[in-house]
């Protein structure tokens, strides 16, 4: 029985905000942990525990007030979440899955062990090992932080010319090396698994990144059937090896030879799934809540032929003053989601917009028109 279920979310940012919005029609109440008073989720009705995300006492308080604990980002205290599991409460996805994904090297090892396609990689404990890896990777590779890397932060493309400097710039953090992949497209597959193991999958999307941050998402991606089927098969096989319920995002690279390699896994609702709010019968946010509470999963069919999303990022530092939203909403098929963040920072995700239409070209055009009208 899911009536009056209480969900706890570690993190109160925009992802928790959109989960809270989706919770209303499901009869679910939401409580979040977030260190910033008036966090985005609290602005749309979530109760908030003001505390650090990793605060052990706060996490236990959250579990006591709710039936199920989940996350809106993966850099959380998995030891505390495992303690919650040991009290008999449900945590989704499973803490061990979150912990595996937190370490990018163990994530690569997990993928390789399970026969899933991933770029060649090497553990690096010394700069000497990095030099050897660089030789093995034909003189060019990605040097990556194992922990706390996101939106391109914690990655560096290195060659013999800059390896030493890059290694030193990272400082005293754990690193690994990954073969440089000259991809032609970036893809993502959003899927959800319920507590019984049933998996549903959304159409593969294409993502466009600028400065390593997602700029635009096309639902569905402009892909041939072979590539689409291959991506969705890989995503399903990946999900079968993950533990716990909820939405997962599998990010991938497509090469010029139509080879697909997994870039990384996100154990949560994801930026690439935002077009599902307007574009799909069941949004990724509603789907996640259904999955973790034991409800029947919703349809992943599309409501429109095409949906295109664009992120609205900060271009300055200071107080947030959104302008042009009303004008943007006058464009056919456009919806705008502002996250209610008080402070704008360069590169910070302040909102997103989505345009739906009969074709990807039309949706993209309308989205770009709306995007040009909005200032933060």
Question: Where are these predicted regions, by residue range?
Answer:
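ATP-binding N-terminal substructure of ATP-dependent carboxylate-amine bond-forming enzymes
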Residues: 1-102, 106, 113, 128, ...
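Peripheral (often C-terminal) accessory segments that flank ATP-dependent C-N-forming ligase machineries
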Residues: 3, 290-376
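Active-site nucleotide/adenylate-binding loops and adjacent lid/helix of ATP-dependent enzymes
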Residues: 100-188, 192-238, 368
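A short linear hydrophobic-aromatic micro-motif
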Residues: 120, 140-143, 174-178, 248-249, ...
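Short acidic-glycine loop/turn motifs at beta-strand connectors
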Residues: 193-198, 255-258, 357-359
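Protein kinase-like catalytic core scaffold
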Residues: 200, 248, 260-264
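Active-site "cap" helix and flanking loop/linker of ATP-utilizing ligase/carboxylase catalytic domains
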Residues: 230-250, 256, 266-317
